[in-house]
């Protein structure tokens, strides 16, 4: 009898040890935030030089812990320039690529005299802000909008003020998610352009619609958490190529506008844009970039999975941006 009890006790102890080893420490769930800071500049067309509208959209994605400290950060910048002629014709761009996407082809070292390319400096800044709170990140901006000595010594010598403004929006909008510190944080960016020539009765336009998709990718290559935003900038001009766009106004993303975007009131939608964007992100959870591409649907309005999740708007921008977040 004693031998039987001893065997039972030994088995119980062994099971307990194995259970403890197998469980391990559970990774802390982190908040995911996405922020976009946008500015615009314009010029008038002349007989010799096309007029231009340039939108600089700096995006930051962050993973934030329960103490408000940034665990991971990713930064990119969509610096998109469109043009129009002195006779009021809009010019279509062949393609758009962000500064990070361009990599070495951005040529900041060769033409700007920088020590490192833009993407390397952005990565250096992101590495530096890991472990810092928002207030500590704000303190990294020097009086000339470049970074403090701490930033420069980390390998980032370019202007960082817009990095910080984007990070501020990202941290302040961060929401609970299933992302952990083990996940890879990425942002995909896709830009669509629509144009219309001007005439004597109506202005023309050259419009940019840039979609940002932030994703925390787990070890299986699947999306553990996601957030999306879209910034629409409509550069207008008259029949003589003179800009009629007000570059002094603030540029806010559709998500950032919230109820003020008024898609329900003016577009007849069932839910506001930010609600539908969240619904798409929910449908993307647990999927790979390839799986997300399959959510497009034949009419660009999403598959039944997307619609059932509560997203009934065009999703091609979401899908194209998400496919790059890998």
Where does each model-flagged region fall?
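Positively charged n-region of N-terminal signal peptides that target proteins for export
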Residues: 1-11
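N-terminal cationic amphipathic segment used for targeting or macromolecule association
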Residues: 8-10, 17, 319
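Intrinsic disorder/low-complexity segments
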Residues: 11-13, 20, 68
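Sec-dependent signal peptide cleavage junction
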Residues: 15-30
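Active-site- and interface-proximal helix/loop "cap" or "latch" segments in soluble metabolic
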Residues: 26-326
